[in-house]
Curated annotation (Swiss-Prot):
Taxonomic lineage from the root: Archaea, Methanobacteriati, Methanobacteriota, Methanomada group, Methanobacteria
Gene3D superfamilies: Luciferase-like domain
EC number: 1.5.98.2
Subcellular location: Cytoplasm
Gene of this entry: mer
Name of this chain's protein: 5,10-methylenetetrahydromethanopterin reductase
Catalytic activity: 5-methyl-5,6,7,8-tetrahydromethanopterin + oxidized coenzyme F420-(gamma-L-Glu)(n) + H(+) = 5,10-methylenetetrahydromethanopterin + reduced coenzyme F420-(gamma-L-Glu)(n)
Record bears the keyword Nucleotide-binding: no
Keywords: Cytoplasm, Methanogenesis, One-carbon metabolism, Oxidoreductase
Length: 321
């Protein structure tokens, strides 16, 4: 099992750099930085992380081809690869409709858009010209091939991830979700003449770890509430939860009733949408994900009640694998 960690660049960048360095020191192999217009710029953040670290692989987790053109992303990730001496990795997904509506961007044909974007970026990163004549001239990646991970959720995206990417970043925390997802990734990989072993299947989890299990759970409840609000009925049915659960949380959060939303998060929702607990409780939960085909565990928001302490505790977990 490989281990990655996610950071949202909404804090001072110096703090994020220190936390990523700590993560590197305790055994994390990947740092994923979210890319959203209302936070600090992902590539400027990554550049400073590259300067402040030595071995950890790093990249956006995830960007999208609507807000950023594939050519701009290719140039940015190649530059990051140079700055980090060959440690760049790229996460790209279809984005979310709510963000595009707010920006006035039309969200059309996500599967074919991602497919075309990855094809263009691979061409540019190889130093070749696209059919339309685009070519990177003043920047060249250190790696012969920068790994490209696809953020994927639905069946078509999961199959496409298996077909054209080096890894799949899946926003899920429960083995049941990977029991459903991994066969679709495998189907896509085999259709392209590859094996599922060629794809790094990453569980991008809602993670909260602490020596106090209750404190860990409490820190994750607001994140679980937002995950529930954005999940479609089939996901709830998979976990034996009422299909209208998402609607209920959407209404609570929509009117700003965060206390009500947190209070409505029960143990069943926590089990479905998060990995929380003490270090001893984490180990079997991560092992269960591995049994379903997960090959990278990503500690996503909130990480824990105290990020620095929680990263150190995750280091204890990593040492068990």
């Amino acid at each position: 099992m490989k281990f990655g960690i996610e950071f949202v660049p909404n804090e001072p960048i110096e703090k994020i750099v220190k936390l990523v360095k700590l993560a590197e020191d305790v055994g994390f192999e990947y740092a994923w930085i979210t890319d959203h217009y209302n936070n600090k710029n992902v590539y400027e953040t990554l550049a400073l992380i590259a300067e402040g670290t030595e071995t950890i692989k790093l990249g956006p987790g995830v960007t999208n081809p609507y807000v950023r053109s594939p050519a701009i992303t290719a140039s940015a990730i190649a530059t990051l690869d140079e700055l980090s001496n060959g440690r760049a990795t790229l996460g790209i997904g279809p984005g979310d409709k709510a963000t595009f509506d707010a920006l006035g961007i039309e969200w059309v044909k996500p599967v074919s858009t991602i497919r075309d974007a990855i094809a263009m970026m691979r061409t540019l990163l190889a130093g070749e010209k696209t059919e339309s004549g685009a070519q990177l001239m003043g920047v060249k990646a250190v790696q012969e091939k920068i790994p490209i991970y696809m953020g994927a959720q639905g069946p078509m995206m999961l199959k496409t991830a298996g077909e054209i990417s080096d890894g799949a970043l899946i926003n899920a925390s429960n083995p049941k979700d990977f029991e459903a997802a991994v066969p679709l990734i495998k189907e896509g990989a085999e259709a392209a003449g590859k094996s599922i072993a060629d794809i790094d299947v990453a569980a991008y989890t809602c993670c909260s770890i602490d020596e106090d299990a209750a404190a860990a759970a409490n820190a994750a409840k607001i994140v679980v509430a937002f995950i529930a609000a954005g999940s479609p009925p089939p996901v709830f049915e998979r976990h034996g939860l009422p299909a209208d659960t998402g609607k209920k949380f959407g209404e609570l959060l929509g009117k700003g009733d965060f206390g009500g939303a947190i209070g409505a998060v029960d143990d069943a929702l926590m089990e479905a949408f998060s990995v929380v607990g003490t270090p001893d409780e984490f180990i079997p939960k991560i092992e269960a994900l591995g049994e379903m085909g997960v090959t990278q565990y990503v500690a996503g928001s909130p990480i824990g009640p105290d990020k620095e302490k929680s990263i150190k505790l995750l280091g204890e977990v990593i040492a068990s694998f």
